[in-house]
């Protein structure tokens, strides 16, 4: 399998770097840090599972994709077009790379922001060979003209090119080989219906449970030559927000702490101490998560409040709140999205050390009445 990437640097499909990650410990020399990071980069690709068997978690998704791969191989055809959606960091890119290996085809990686002009997507399409996979991350951000070029490409395997302008314009069709388009998005509802309906298989990636993440951490620790015991892996997993990408990032930061403050081995006490230092609490909330909830409670009496007001008060943009912070806070029951706006749940109050107000039953009743009468 060959991987052909046209991603801009820092694209979402790449492992995310924490904007609030603490600086490297002062005791470690710059040379040591640079050497370690170079070694780490060599292992980055090796952390990705190579096939569906090695891919941890997402049991239902693996079963569906396993059938799709086996059926396509038996018929000698390419995979149908696929759309993966879910919060960032759950493995949408990794599973696409695995599908390319399973089908023994090339995969071309790009992101929607890199396809600003119609000729950008046209240039990728004409390079495809039979069976190739074209992976577009953040596909909900495709420009309208670019999206319209994909319609005949996905449905009829042809590229329609407009030659000339005005009354002299004419359309020339270029045949394309049968290929597979894989789209990845954190906002499936933002896709237009014509584009979404052209995907033959639409699958949601869910958050991972602690056991699944602990298994990923143990596996990746072995690949990175990190000594870790099961309680240590479980502690990191509990604070990883159900996300493998975050689990891998925390593993490396705890590794740093263990090397500087301990004997290099990650145990449960070492993991707890390290993650407290990095301000990741036992539920996986970092400083920004807690600030978001605290702002909701202190400035807006727990809500309900619109996301625009919450964004203005915290200095975050609405898209970041909706795509990065809200999914996990809602998953663990700390944030409620009602017809009236965002609300902090009683569990969020207790987690931050506040006494929950006595109004939740009344608000819940009002929302139920609104819902019954079709009000938004």
UniProtKB/Swiss-Prot annotation:
InterPro entries: AAA+_ATPase, AAA_lid_4, DNA_helicase_Holl-junc_RuvB, P-loop_NTPase, RuvB-like_N, RuvB_C, WH-like_DNA-bd_sf, WH_DNA-bd_sf. Mg(2+) binds at residue 93. Its main location: cytoplasm. Residues 1-51 are annotated as: Disordered. GO terms for biological process: DNA recombination; DNA repair. Its EC number is 3.6.4.-. Residues 209-279 are annotated as: Small ATPAse domain (RuvB-S). GO terms for cellular component: cytoplasm; Holliday junction resolvase complex. SUPFAM superfamilies: P-loop containing nucleoside triphosphate hydrolases, Winged helix' DNA-binding domain. It is found in: Cytoplasm. Residues 13-208 are annotated as: Large ATPase domain (RuvB-L). Residues 36-48 have a biased composition (Basic and acidic residues). It catalyses: ATP + H2O = ADP + phosphate + H(+). It is an enzyme of class 3 (hydrolase). DNA binds at residues 337, 342. Residues 282-376 are annotated as: Head domain (RuvB-H). Homohexamer. Forms an RuvA(8)-RuvB(12)-Holliday junction (HJ) complex. HJ DNA is sandwiched between 2 RuvA tetramers; dsDNA enters through RuvA and exits via RuvB. An RuvB hexamer assembles on each DNA strand where it exits the tetramer. Each RuvB hexamer is contacted by two RuvA subunits (via domain III) on 2 adjacent RuvB subunits; this complex drives branch migration. In the full resolvosome a probable DNA-RuvA(4)-RuvB(12)-RuvC(2) complex forms which resolves the HJ. NCBIfam families: PRK00080.1, ruvB. Has 3 domains, the large (RuvB-L) and small ATPase (RuvB-S) domains and the C-terminal head (RuvB-H) domain. The head domain binds DNA, while the ATPase domains jointly bind ATP, ADP or are empty depending on the state of the subunit in the translocation cycle. During a single DNA translocation step the structure of each domain remains the same, but their relative positions change. This is Holliday junction branch migration complex subunit RuvB. It comes from Gloeobacter violaceus (strain ATCC 29082 / PCC 7421). The gene is ruvB.
């Amino acid at each position: 399998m060959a991987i052909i990437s046209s991603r801009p640097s820092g694209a979402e499909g790449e492992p995310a770097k924490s904007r609030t990650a603490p600086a490297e410990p002062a005791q470690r020399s710059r040379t040591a840090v640079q050497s370690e990071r170079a070694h780490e980069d060599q292992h980055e690709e090796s952390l990705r599972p190579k096939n569906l068997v090695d891919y941890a978690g997402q049991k239902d998704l693996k079963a569906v994709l396993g059938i799709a791969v086996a059926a396509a191989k038996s018929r000698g055809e390419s995979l149908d077009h696929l759309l993966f959606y879910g919060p960032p960091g759950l493995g949408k890119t990794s599973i696409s790379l695995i599908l390319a290996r399973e089908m023994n085809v090339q995969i071309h990686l790009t992101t929607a922001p890199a396809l600003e002009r119609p000729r950008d997507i046209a240039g990728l399409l004409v390079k495809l060979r039979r069976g190739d996979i074209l992976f577009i991350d953040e596909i909900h951000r495709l420009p309208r003209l670019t999206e319209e070029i994909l319609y005949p490409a996905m449905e009829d395997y042809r590229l329609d090119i407009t030659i000339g302008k005005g009354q002299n314009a004419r359309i020339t069709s270029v045949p394309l080989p049968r290929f597979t388009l894989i789209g990845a998005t954190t906002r499936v509802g933002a896709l237009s219906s014509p584009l979404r309906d052209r995907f033959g298989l639409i699958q949601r990636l869910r958050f991972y449970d602690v056991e699944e993440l602990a298994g990923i951490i143990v596996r990746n620790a072995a690949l990175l030559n990190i000594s870790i015991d099961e309680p240590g892996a479980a502690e990191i997993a509990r604070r990883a927000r159900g996300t493998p990408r975050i689990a891998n990032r925390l593993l490396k930061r705890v590794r740093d702490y263990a090397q500087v403050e301990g004997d290099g081995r990650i145990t449960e006490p070492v993991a707890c101490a390290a993650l407290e230092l990095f301000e990741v609490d036992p539920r996986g909330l970092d400083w920004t998560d807690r600030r978001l909830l605290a702002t909701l409670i202190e400035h807006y009496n727990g809500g309900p409040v619109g996301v625009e007001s919450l964004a203005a008060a915290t200095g975050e943009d609405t898209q970041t709140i909706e795509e990065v912070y809200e999914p996990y806070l809602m998953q663990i029951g700390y944030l409620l999205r009602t017809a009236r706006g965002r609300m902090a749940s009683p569990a969020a109050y207790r987690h931050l050390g506040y006494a929950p107000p006595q109004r939740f039953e009344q608000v819940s009743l009002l929302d139920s009445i609104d819902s019954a009468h079709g009000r938004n």
